[in-house]
From Swiss-Prot:
Gene: bioF
Entry annotated with the keyword Transferase: yes
SUPFAM superfamilies: PLP-dependent transferases
Name of protein: 8-amino-7-oxononanoate synthase
Known catalytic reactions: 6-carboxyhexanoyl-[ACP] + L-alanine + H(+) = (8S)-8-amino-7-oxononanoate + holo-[ACP] + CO2
Amino acid sequence: MSKSFAEELEMLKAQGLHRRMRRIAGSQGSRAVVDGKEALLLCSNNYLGLADHPRLAEAAIRAVERYGTSSGASRLVSGTMELHALLEERIARFKGTGAALVFNSGYAANSGIIPALVGKGDVVFSDRLNHASIVDGCLLSRATMVRYPHNDTAALRRLMERHETAGRRLLVTDGVFSMDGDMAPLRELAALKREFGALLMVDDAHGTGVLGATGRGSAELQGVMAEIDIHMGTLGKALGSFGAYAAASEDVIDYLANKARSFIFSTSLPPAVLAASLAAVDLVDSPDGAALRERLARNTAFFREGLCAAGFDTMGSETQIVPLFVGGAEETMAFTARLLEAGVFAQGIRPPTVPAGTCRLRCTLMATHAEEDLARAVALMAAIGKGMGVI
């Protein structure tokens, strides 16, 4: 080897790009103990506060008592328990599709679904800011990958015109972009998919449970639920559990069950996770879920308005993901460290997750955040930002 792992690690450290894991003690509530210090948690995807909700915990406990701790096998062997079927039926009803299929994670879903749908001779159109799991799914598929400028539907149209003679065409996008907090223009994308005879897949990991009148996500918010061919979403963010799903027509789901390698060759999700997910979907699809979404929306508006009033650039965020632009990697991580020392944990984001020069704090709001805590966080950020010359 030309370079040792130790040498490469030293290079990452010199570039300000070395990462380490911080230890969280206790549950993922609005406050947590981070590396032994209590802090306001502003970087969890537990948007509705369901990760420590008693209904989910009780459902998981009951499932362990009845079904044990493991599914014991992959889904196509003996690993399909009745809870898998019940959860998939519930997700299909929730998303308004013919069927659904549960995967072990969002990464497993995208890296399995996309190569199952397209291959050599096909083309996949992918937003340049799509999640890494979508990019990897496209690469694994061996289809021609065409990346279009972020949310630029005019540029996308030109690219689709160039590939009209391709085999199967797949248009894939995040519903909510995880690092910027903005949304895909799903109405325009749906029109393009109709015009060019493409399939439209939406990864709504950060919209499911949060957006739309009933929490069905960004497609519901934009009025195009029926236009999406493959709804992908996760169970471990707003829904407070673990895993992911695809929701689509019965034929597409049957096809994925037979072709998606990440589904076929993995031991399936355990009973506790399935039961917690079922409880989460029921809760989201209820008046209690609506109340949580309203609280999250209020917290998000309060926090974003406070940052903007202080002079921060929130990078066009439209959702509960609110980035705070800093710029350089070292400055961003210094900002994070100063905040944590003062009792606020907002994770700095650096390359390769975001392009160089666009490093930011990625703040994520919860329904369970208290307004006074958010006000204190904004004041701290403003003081640190002024001291560092960010604002």
